[in-house]
Structure formats: structure tokens, C-alpha cells
Amino acid sequence: MEKYDLAIIGAGPVGLFAASFANLHGLKTITFDALDEVGGQINMLYPQKDIKDIPAFSSIKGKELVSRLFEQTENTKLTLSHKVKKISFSTGEDIIIDDDYQVKSLLIATGLGAFKPKTLPLSTTPELQAHIHYSMQHPEIFSNKKVAILGGGDSALDWALELSKTSDVYVVHRRNEFRGLESSVSQLKSLKNVELLTPYLPKELHLNNNRIELVLHRVGASHDFITKDVDEILVAYGFKSDNRQLRKWGIELENNLISVSQTMQTNLPHVYAIGDAITYPGRVPMIALGFGEAQIAISSIMQDLFPEKTMTFHSTSI
């Protein structure tokens, strides 16, 4: 059985930073992820997204952020395509993972957990489905085309800004107000090749000569419809997350998120959690906040495992 000071579940941006920070403090660490590559949701869904709320970067592509974080983990063990299914506690308080790994502490950084995009609630055909997308992993698909983006959150607005560089874009949202950054909305309004269609919902889809006739219904007006011809549809309705595995492990959840203390500890001994998997009063889902939570958690784990050691906080130490 392999032995480690710390196991991290989740190799998204926050999990990767936690692994590098743990290594900085000398913790023997192993990181698991169910996917076959690092980066989590960013890498799977929007690697080309310009992320603008990371300190020291006015803007950085999702895939570049993941790449830089991954470089920092070169001295830690990473086990991909491994979905952790079982954790148990030994008599000596160590944690046993999948009967193969014995660790002194566990850090959960699984984000939304197993997630699936919320699908477009309209009847479609296989031919139509070929033109309906739920991520922007391959932006070249949309180049020089007319694209309808459905949704009003940050992802929809970010995708619209990115695609506007090479495509004509419709953004369809059921409300007049968007849920994303006001700066993004203002920027989109200034672009001649972007049209914001509010308050509308998609009503029907028809395929005609390999183009989609998108029928939109104006919210609150029973007989008000418009039709737009597009080549591709990009759906940004958010995701359904599944954290049932955490419940099986006995971890306390609140609204499907992990409840943590000020030290990022869960209700279980030596089990901590960080990032978008957790909740506490005032928390907002931001990557940069997750980085800070990783530092708090690793510092707490160090004090838990090695109380006799004097912690060095590198950023401000002389």
C-alpha cells in the first residue's frame, strides 16, 4: 500500500495549486483526477476562454493558466483517469483510499463534482444535434459562421466575445438583464457583428439546407416570434452537478456543497475541502479565491500533522 502525507482529489486549477503549495511545505502528496488530463472544467469546457480575474494577469487563456499551474506540480505524483470510489479510516486515524493508498490527510478539490451540461429542452434530430454544442473546446468549428449562443451568464458572454472575433453572433437570453459582468455586456453591445436578443427563449429548431432555423419566442408575449438562421448553436445553460459520492463518504453537504470551517476542514477528521466544491458564508465561485483556500487548507494540514513545526509563510517571511 502506497503511503502519503496528503491526497488531493481533483486536478483542476485549485487542486493543482494546492499540490504545488503542499510540495513547497514538504508534504508527500498524490493527486487524483477522474479525467485523463489536468485542468478540470476549464480544460473540458472553455480552454480558449480569456480569464480576467487572476492576479498579475490582465487576461490569460484557460489552457495557459492550466499549463502554468501544471508546471508547478512537477515534483508531486499525479494519477489521472482514477475516480476515487472509497475512503475509509484506519484504527490509527490514517485514511485509506480505494484500499490501495494510505494517507494522513485528504483534500477535496473536485469543483462541481461530476457535472453534465444542462441540455436544450427542445425536440431535435441527430442531424440537428450535430450543430448543437455545450462547450467551446474547438473554437475553429464556429469560425466564419453565424452562431447563436443561448444563455445569459458569464460563460455565454465570454463565448460571445471570443467568437465575435471570427463570427457573427446572436446572444439569446430569457431576461433583459444579464447575469454576467457588465463590462462584457457593454463590450458586446458595441460590436456590430453581435446582436443581443432579449427577452427571448428558443421555441423550435428546423434544419434547412444544413442551416438551422431558430424560432424564438418573446417572453411574456404569447404570439410574438422571430426566426434567425444560424449555422451552429452554443448552449450555456450551466451544469448539473453530482456529489452523491461525497454523501456516501459521510461528508456533510449544504445545498450539494461541502460545509467547511474557517480552516477548510470538513466534518470528518483530517479531511479538508477547497474551491467550488465548498460553501461558507460570503463565498463566491472564483478561481483566485480557491487559490487562497488552498493555502489555508495546506497550512491547516501542516499544523494538524506536524504541530511541533514552525510554519513559514513564504509570501511575507523575511
Swiss-Prot record:
Per UniProt, which keywords does this protein have? FAD, Flavoprotein, NADP, Oxidoreductase
Q: Top enzyme class of this protein?
A: oxidoreductase
Residues given in the record as FAD binding sites: 33, 41, 46, 84, 115, 276, 316
Cofactor(s) in the UniProt record: FAD
Q: What superkingdom does the record give?
A: Bacteria
Entry note: cofactor: Binds 1 FAD per subunit.
What is this protein's record name? Ferredoxin--NADP reductase
